[in-house]
Amino acid sequence: MERRSRTAEVLEVGDDLNIRAAGSRDELEQAYRLVYLSFLQREYIQASASELRLSFFNALPETVTFIADLRGEIIATVTLVPDSPAGLPMDEIYRHEIQALRDQGRRLAEVTMLADRRHEMRRALPVVLLLMKRVFDYSTLVLKANDLCITINPRHETYYRRFLLFQQLGGLKSYPSVRNNPALAERLDLDRVREECEGNDRLLTQFFTDRTPMGTLRERYMMTAEDVQRFFVELTDTFREAPADKITYLTRLHPEYPWGQWRP
């Protein structure tokens, strides 16, 4: 009998799992809470009254949160942040490395806020791969991005390089946003990834060549002003703590928001 590939083994996931962009305020809130619980368990953050983990970048209109929905329960999530004048989350510690890509004229997007209810990469890997497939398709087909960037804990480096073909972008650093836990910057060159996967197992090749239908990719929930107020003003202090230049950028995008009330 032919030995199955490791990729085939990790991709054995039931048909009841639905990978898609969050479709409502409630699903976004569930996703933010799952990230909070996952990060709290890993000691990336301290406990907070809101029990939500989100940042200024979640308020940007181009940011997309993807979810793994298992019979109505969100069991995993990841967020994709396209580059903009507001920058990327990882600019906090990898500004030089990210700017070098920008200076080459490359279009960037960052993968962030990855969480699974199992809190362990080895067990979560099948669902993580399916989420990353949707991220990959959205980045290439909708954003027309050249690179996917991510900061990871060094202990997960093997997974990202073996299964997703990421390569190192920046060296080991402490990340203040996750209580100074260690981080590595990784990059996936979307322009060359199909060449890179040649010679790998068949399912890995399919991962990077099969395409999610465009109509499915574009289905996503856009936050209303009420949603923004709830998440970033009422439940958290995100807007009050955000740097002035980032709020100025968001104000230009959404002048209709009641900024005088939100940041008096």
Named regions from a protein language model:
Residues L88-R192:
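Acyl-donor binding region in acyl/amide transferases
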Residues E27, Q41, L70-R71, D137-N146:
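Secondary-structure boundary elements
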Residues M113, N180-Y249:
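Charge-rich, low-complexity intrinsically disordered segments
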Residues S5-F57, T65-I67, I74:
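Short amphipathic alpha-helix that is part of the acyltransferase structural core
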